[in-house]
Amino acid sequence: MAPLDEGRSCMPIGYNYTSTCTQGGYPTYVVNVSTVAQIQLSVNFARNQNLRLIVKNTGHDFNGKPSGKGGLSIWTHRLKDKVFYPSFTADGGYVGPAIKLGAGVQVSEAYDFGKELNVTVIGGGCLSVGVSGGFTLGGGHSPLSSMYGMAADQVLALEVVLADGRFITATSKQNSDVFWMLLGGGGSTIGVVTSMTVKAYPQLPTTLVTFNWTMNDTPNAEAFWAAFQSYLDNFEDFVNAGTYGYYFLGSSGAEKGEASSGETDYNFRMVSFVAPNMTVPETQNLLKPWFDTLNSLNVSFIPIYSHADNFYEVWEEDNFPLETGGLDIYKLASRLLPRNVFENQDLRNRNFLAQKDAVDKGLFIMGFHISGKGSAVEPPTNIAVLPAWRDALSHVIVATEWDFTSSWETVYNSSLFVTDWMDALREISPDSGAYMNEGDLLEPNFQQAFYGANYPRLYELKQKYDPTGLFFALTAVGSEDWEVQVTDPLPYSWNNNGRLCPRSS
């Protein structure tokens, strides 16, 4: 998914920079596993031969974690088993329906399985992502998070192959420190997860709304931006109601990698406004204060409503738009914005001005109104999900794109610009953090941003269960003890296209 981190060494046909295709940062060895025993053999072989070890599920990672020059990759994509338990008794006290998912089960497959059983499974927005890989291990936000919390909150039991080759079950009471670490502490840390058993909820009637407006749909630029600002003013009410919104904000050129500072062909697109357990009239009533403001500003927009007696049907009808993978034309950074940013008028205004500034400078926003706590359930306290998620009302991704033929210098400067720009949101949320799965490879103090107060214990457990550092991934727990000796012109200190070596003191 992120060829930039492999050194642009083997691009898809039509996007290659030269006529050659070299190994670059792609693993040298790949084991297409279908059994736990094969994973154990692979882990033991890599450890005994001192090979760099990589874990890959579907490869959906913005920062190149499924790659590594000269490494051995364990590919878990074929672990597709699914088992339904009508009544599952978990160590933590949960009693109810549950589903066991093999590590290779993708979101679409989990959703389809749940639909057949008339239950709801918490998965991600993108249907092709693996449920039991880095998505859930990094926390995992969902269109249903504002109601039920993070994907990691749903896990009742894990099966894991540890760095020493042992195959264990981890629950809140059995191997509880492994359970705690893996649920929020990220993937590629101390073991290979082979399956997860997760909660299954009743089917949930859901309404979904989409709409957009462009600069041409408003009387002037002031009205365009006032319309967006009024959305931010309603975040608290939307999240408190258990809804989720995914929006795009930027110029048409920004989506094509052709944006320039000062371009004013702006558009706002509500990709998905998800209202679980709400009818269309109830959703319309919730949106009315915002829509009244848009109408008073003479903004032209047409909301399209869809409703079904289960979440899956509306999401499959209009879910995350699929994007072209395998291209190195983007760089992103993100920030979780806590509730106080929206309660405080000054902070809310600074948030608005920051996002406007990003768009004015040729960047684009992929943002969410979302809660990582969940309005219908209490989040567990025995897992390592980034604490900032529990107080967040928004997850904001700021990104840039460039033409795929851009020079290394352009890529480098564009990347640093996004990292530096994110200071505007860091400053209004100094005690918050960023979602590791959609975060900046160059995030300053990634330990605090991605893991928060959990990091000291996470690092301690890393030394306990993987003292030799067999498992490594960019920005993962303990990765500061290692460095990649890069061989390509991109002067990142973090890059997969090079030999992995212990960091000199």
What do the PLM-derived regions correspond to, one by one?
Residues 1-505:
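Soluble FAD-dependent oxygen oxidases
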